[in-house]
């Protein structure tokens, strides 16, 4: 009976061996200490045999945040054996605001996790992303100047409100002065100095060039006769010229205000905040000083 089961299972084990040999050749089983360099990419996964594939580059934390900077290509070099495992130096072109924190190369053991042989192409990098001194300064300056959120809009709204209040007061004063000038110029009646009025008989006193006594029974006010009749005229002195000058000045001022482009301080959902460049050039955090090749050092983790 035992021999029968052995005969039945023998083809099955033979098929497993053939499948194993076909899928994983001896070249896929490499000694970890012999690996000198590995190049890892952000958009690729590792090879896997006993476990699931993992990303070749994986951020696991850090005070900069994993989304602050995503390296596209990292190259790790074998820097020697410490008696326990391989030590690595991983290098990447990185903004001066960031640096590697903890780095650890993770490889899949070929037959078991602690196997000194690993599956070729199964190594990936786990790292933390930290802020440099420059990065911390840029972050602090950015929070102070922009507010990052409601503080940003609140501070700009307050400054705009104060500017609006001041300009509204000036405009109101201008409007009052303009209204007064218009009233004096057009609405108030001209002052008449001893202007004669024609009498009820239709007699035109303007044809006379000298004064004479009024007829008996008539008052001198009615007939318009007076000693100063010949010099009577409408007063168009300081009131007229003051109103005219005020209107001209106000027209010039309002014309200049209309000629200046309007710039709203509020957020535009299509283009972002619509402040002018001059309003923000002193509020922006300092720009990065550049990019350099950053290095991180760490050991090996098996899986």
Swiss-Prot record:
Ordered alphabetically, the record's keywords are:
Calcium, Calcium transport, Endoplasmic reticulum, Ion transport, Membrane, Signal, Transmembrane, Transmembrane helix, Transport
Q: Where is the composition biased (Polar residues)?
A: 265-276
Describe its membrane topology. Single-pass type I membrane protein
Cytoplasmic side residue ranges read 190-303
Instruction: Give the UniProt entry's GO cellular component terms.
Output: endoplasmic reticulum membrane; endoplasmic reticulum-plasma membrane contact site
Pfam families under this entry?
SARAF
| Residues in compartment: Lumenal | 24-168
| Keyword Ion transport attached | yes
Q: Name one GO biological process term.
A: calcium ion transport
Give start-end of the signal peptide. 1-23
* Localisation per UniProt entry: Endoplasmic reticulum membrane
Q: Give the transmembrane region(s).
A: 169-189
Q: Which InterPro entries match?
A: SARAF
Ranges for region Disordered: 195-224, 265-303
Q: Does the keyword Lyase apply?
A: no
PANTHER family per UniProt: STORE-OPERATED CALCIUM ENTRY-ASSOCIATED REGULATORY FACTOR
- Briefly, what is this protein's role? Negative regulator of store-operated Ca(2+) entry (SOCE) involved in protecting cells from Ca(2+) overfilling. In response to cytosolic Ca(2+) elevation after endoplasmic reticulum Ca(2+) refilling, promotes a slow inactivation of STIM (stim1 or stim2)-dependent SOCE activity.
Q: Which family does it belong to?
A: Belongs to the SARAF family.
Tell me the protein's name: Store-operated calcium entry-associated regulatory factor
Q: Which organism is it from?
A: Xenopus laevis (African clawed frog)
């Amino acid at each position: 009976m035992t021999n029968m089961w052995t005969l039945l299972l023998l083809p099955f084990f033979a098929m497993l061996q053939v499948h194993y040999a076909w899928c994983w050749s001896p070249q896929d089983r490499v000694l970890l200490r012999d690996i000198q360099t590995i190049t890892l990419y952000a958009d690729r996964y590792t090879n896997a045999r006993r476990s699931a594939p993992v990303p070749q580059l994986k951020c696991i934390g850090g005070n900069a945040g994993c989304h602050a900077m995503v390296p596209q290509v990292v190259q790790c070099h074998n820097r020697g054996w410490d008696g326990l495992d391989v030590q690595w130096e991983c290098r990447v072109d990185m903004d001066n605001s960031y640096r590697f924190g903890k780095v650890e190369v993770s490889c899949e053991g070929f037959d078991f996790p602690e196997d000194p042989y690993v599956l070729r192409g199964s190594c990936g990098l786990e790292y933390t992303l930290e802020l440099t001194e420059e990065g911390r300064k840029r972050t602090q300056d950015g929070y102070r100047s922009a507010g990052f959120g409601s503080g940003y809009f609140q501070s700009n709204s307050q400054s705009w409100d104060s500017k609006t209040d001041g300009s509204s007061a000036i405009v109101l004063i201008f409007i009052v002065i303009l209204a007064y000038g218009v009233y004096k110029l057009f609405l108030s009646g001209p002052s008449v100095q001893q202007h004669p009025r024609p009498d009820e008989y239709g007699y035109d006193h303007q044809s006379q060039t000298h004064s004479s006594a009024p007829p008996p029974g008539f008052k001198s006010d009615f007939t318009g006769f007076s000693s100063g009749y010949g010099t009577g005229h409408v007063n168009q002195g300081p009131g007229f010229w003051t109103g005219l000058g005020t209107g001209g000045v106000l027209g010039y001022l309002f014309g200049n205000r209309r000629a200046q482009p309007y710039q709203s301080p509020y957020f535009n959902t299509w283009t972002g905040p619509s402040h002018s460049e001059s309003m923000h050039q002193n509020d922006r955090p300092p720009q990065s000083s550049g990019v350099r090749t950053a290095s991180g050092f760490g050991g090996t983790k098996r899986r």
